[in-house]
Amino acid sequence: MNVTTTRKDLMIVNMGPHHPSMHGVLRLILTLDGEDVIDCEPILGYLHRGMEKIAENRTVIQYLPYVTRWDYLATMFTEAITINGPEQLGNIQVPKRASYIRIIMLELSRIASHLLWLGPFMADIGAQTPFFYIFRERELVYDLFEAATGMRMMHNYFRIGGVAADLPYGWIDKCLDFCDYFLTAVSEYQKLITRNPIFLERVEGVGIIGGEEAINWGLSGPMLRASGIEWDLRKVDRYECYGELDWEIRWQKEGDSLARYLVRMSEMTESIKIIQQALEGIPGGPYENLEIRCFDIEKDPEWDGFEYRFISKKPSPTFELPKQELYVRVEAPKGELGIFLIGDQSGFPWRWKIRPPGFINLQILPQLVKRMKLADIMTILGSIDIIMGEVDR
């Protein structure tokens, strides 16, 4: 009697780069045994544009419009890190009013980023309704951005020594009204989502990361705080005026996808608390340190140089970066966004190394999805929160 043997063949599947759950042009090469994930290999680089090399051939002001294309959903943070480096290299003092305006814009940008994480994350695991709800509040944030900066996205608002323009008349009252309304919207999200049994089935206990493991992988932001580590650069470095405001670090100890969801939801309410304090305590005075223009150096082009022959005009005066090196960082919505900057006494940086949080956080994805089901990949990847413009640079 012949006994039939079951033959098991592994299947290799390409997920992305055009898959709607990839949040950009990420490609995953999956090895599957039925529904079980045996191996996962991320393929990056489809959105690589050479942002670091572009920075080394531009002045800081020329480079500002480029940086908003890294994380194009939280552009205020990429602008902040771009001007913080030269400010620290040159010992440039930022007026208190400008620092408060920056904090307000950064926290509004954090809220907008978390909202546009929440909607697609819920859609990935099968809940369509929140995807439409989040755009209602996100439009209000973009209305505030448009009134203050002139742009809904890609704002180009931060400047060395301050910001590009002061807040318009009536903007503070409009922003305070938004803060009061948004707290009710967050409570509506929590009633709709947090205790939903289907949602809990999809996220609870999925993609668990321990605290020590998160540190060893170099994770940051909500990924780190959801694993029981109370670490927030706004508290640690106290950049801008965060040290003058009263707020708390939101964290969870479970380390799963549910914990990362809870951290981001509570971070939005903390951002509202920060914005309200900043709006009520914003001082008067200038919004830009005009003394910085005294450091601008004008160079005469050579008669056979590029400017004379092709541009037909003199280059504008620009701030020279001192011959030093510096690492500067901010707490972006996805984690620690940093820049390693080397100046060489010229208008162009000698080295501009970007430390993107999404790229570092994405490293742990293959380990998290192994021995999980195929459907859990969307949950885990969505809970990491990546933007491929920032990952590939």
From Swiss-Prot:
Q: What are the record keywords, sorted?
A: Chloroplast, Membrane, NAD, NADP, Plastid, Plastoquinone, Quinone, Thylakoid, Translocase, Transport
Membrane topology is:
Peripheral membrane protein
Q: Where in the cell is it found?
A: Plastid, Chloroplast thylakoid membrane
One term under GO cellular component: chloroplast thylakoid membrane
HAMAP family the record matches = NDH1_NuoD
**Family in the record:** Belongs to the complex I 49 kDa subunit family.
The name under which this protein is listed is: NAD(P)H-quinone oxidoreductase subunit H, chloroplastic
